[in-house]
A protein has these predicted regions:
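Gly-rich Lys/Arg/Thr-decorated short loops/hinges at beta-loop-alpha junctions or inter-strand turns
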Residues: 17-24, 174-176, 283-290
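Terminal amphipathic helices with adjacent charged low-complexity linkers/tails
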Residues: 68-69, 205-250, 269-278, 334-339
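Short, C-terminally biased terminal segments at protein or domain edges
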Residues: 250-268
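Mobile "lid/hinge" segments at catalytic clefts and subdomain interfaces of large enzymes
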Residues: 131, 135-223, 419-470, 474
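Long hydrophobic segments that form regular secondary structure
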Residues: 283-287, 297-318, 461, 467, ...
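Small-residue-enriched alpha-helical segments and adjacent helix-cap loops
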Residues: 20-165, 191, 289-431
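Intrinsic, low-complexity N-terminal interaction/targeting segments
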Residues: 2-16, 82-83, 274-277
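Active-site cores of enzymes that catalyze phosphoryl transfer or operate on phosphate-rich substrates
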Residues: 267-292, 297
């Protein structure tokens, strides 16, 4: 065995889970090429696994491994760029891009070269291997499919065609990073990221002596305070006086200025399905196609098939999204119909109106020691029920609803989706059932009436969606509809016969 088992795994250091070993492959920028798809297909064949999963960081993970990846497999992964040559830094290559970087009609800055430069910086510095393997940096080019609301430690958001706004993770676990009143030119971004990562390293060396777990960036910032943290960063930058971090969200709460207005107009894509389906690119006569992977699962034949489609009809690129879906890009208009047919033949969905596009679920009791319920199975059961009984189409159809988000969590950690969903089902260890939260409101009309046994979930959620369709006011959001229902009314809706 060559690997030590880890809490947060990478290619070289798997984690022990209830269903076996868990390994994650970092995909910097979330973009795969055809050769990497071939390597993934071979990896699935070698390990005997049915599928690989796209994660909510736009990486890939393998579950239920019976042993560590051997040397030959790791060599194949490093040869094609799916693993780092230096095992010390493999796990910190969490680099998230806007999934439509370089092809988005509304994009302000193409962030791909900047992200590539950051990856080169990380992989050349073994000393940064001390950072948490959850450490992540996001690059948002200001296009229609944004990632500024994803819970990265650092995010750079393009605010015009020359500058980025710096965001840092300061809040609670799973919270989106916040602006810190620093604007950077393109050439200033890499030095700033380097200074922050080195300052984070110093903090780990200090706090890690007594910490029970490796400190996250937010822990280091909390220890020194935002001002103190920025002072150390400034020293790393040779004392640039204009880089003083401030909690800009707090300042905007008192009154917003021009900068706040500019950022307010940026499209946030929380649980956004807008990238699914066919979309025109910034390049003439080129389109991208967003494809649903139910619960992020991507089986061997689909890996092979999408790789062949990307090579034959696109530019060879397959883009992973933090919503656990896939984008095929650079397709000619004349080939769209054929590509859609090929995708359908692979058993995949390329529209935003399928129930599978609404669902997020953690590993649950089948794969995690903390899971109280089998979230994967229960989410699939709900998806099948909704698909058989409803047409979930936000553009029209038998049941017209805006895309909702439904989150199954086996415990209170919310690993699959850190931010609030429209409907959340929390695994309850005492009852092995689900506690239900709807738009932030829990059905508490009587003790334990907020608890749903797994077999009751599909009908209850179906009742709620149907009630929203039939009883809502014109243009009323799901959250507004559920907020104006009393606990008794919600209970009656959920448990209607």
């Amino acid at each position: 065995m060559i690997a030590e088992h880890a809490i947060c795994p990478d290619s070289y250091h798997p984690a022990v889970a209830r269903d076996g070993l868990l390994t994650r492959l970092r995909i910097p920028g979330g973009v795969l090429n055809v050769a990497q798809c071939v390597a993934i297909e071979q990896l699935l064949a070698t390990t005997g696994l049915d599928y690989i999963q796209v994660t909510n960081r736009a990486n890939l993970q393998l579950r239920a491994l019976t042993k560590d990846l051997d040397r030959d497999v790791l060599t194949a992964l490093t040869d094609c760029g799916l693993a780092a040559n230096d095992r010390a830094v493999d796990g910190i290559r969490n680099i998230m891009l806007s999934p439509t970087a370089g092809i988005d009609l509304q994009e302000l800055i193409d962030v791909r070269s900047l992200a590539a430069a950051w990856h080169d910086y990380l992989t050349d510095r073994s000393e940064l291997g001390i950072l948490s393997t959850k450490f992540s940096v996001g690059f948002d080019g200001g296009g229609s499919v944004g990632i500024v609301d994803r819970p990265n430690d650092i995010t750079l958001l393009a605010v015009n065609d020359r500058e980025f706004e710096l965001y840092l993770s300061i809040g609670n676990r799973g919270s989106a990073p916040i602006p810190v009143d620093v604007r950077l030119g393109v050439d200033e971004c890499l030095p700033m990221l380097a200074a922050i990562s080195q300052t984070y390293r110093y903090g780990i060396e200090l706090l890690g002596r007594t910490a029970r777990r490796k400190p996250r960036l937010r822990d280091v910032i909390e220890h020194w305070g935002l001002t103190g943290f920025s002072e150390i960063v400034r020293r790393e930058l040779a004392g640039s006086s204009r880089f003083i971090f401030k909690n800009l969200d707090e300042q905007r709460g008192a009154g917003s200025g021009e900068r706040g207005t500019e950022l307010k107009n940026h499209t946030l894509n929380r649980d956004n399905n807008d990238h699914l389906g066919i979309h025109q690119q910034s390049q003439p006569d080129r389109y991208y196609l967003g494809i649903v992977l139910p619960l992020g699962r991507w089986n061997r034949s689909q890996v092979k098939g999408l790789g062949e489609i990307a090579e034959g009809y696109g530019s060879g690129a397959i883009r992973l999204t933090p919503w656990q879906n896939i984008i095929l890009s650079d397709i000619k208009s004349a080939d769209l119909e054929r590509v859609q047919l090929l995708i359908t033949e692979l058993g995949l969905i390329h529209t935003a109106n399928h129930p599978s596009s609404l669902l997020r679920a953690c590993a649950g009791s089948s794969g995690c020691q903390f899971g109280a319920t089998d979230t994967q199975r229960d989410a699939i059961d709900l998806s099948n029920y909704l698909a058989a009984n409803f047409t979930l189409d936000h553009l029209g159809g038998a049941l017209r609803v805006r895309p909702l988000s439904i989150h199954f969590s086996g415990c209170d950690k919310s690993c699959a989706q850190h931010d609030r969903a429209d409907i959340t089902l929390w695994g309850d260890e005492r009852t092995r059932s689900y506690r239900l939260a709807i738009g932030g409101i829990t059905d508490r009309s009587e003790p334990d009436q907020s608890v749903l046994a797994p077999p009751a979930v599909p009908i209850a959620i179906g009742n709620l969606i149907a009630a929203y369709h039939h009883q809502r006011h014109p243009q009323e959001s799901f959250e507004s509809f559920t907020t104006r229902q009393s606990p008794v009314q919600l209970h009656q809706i959920l448990h209607a016969v």
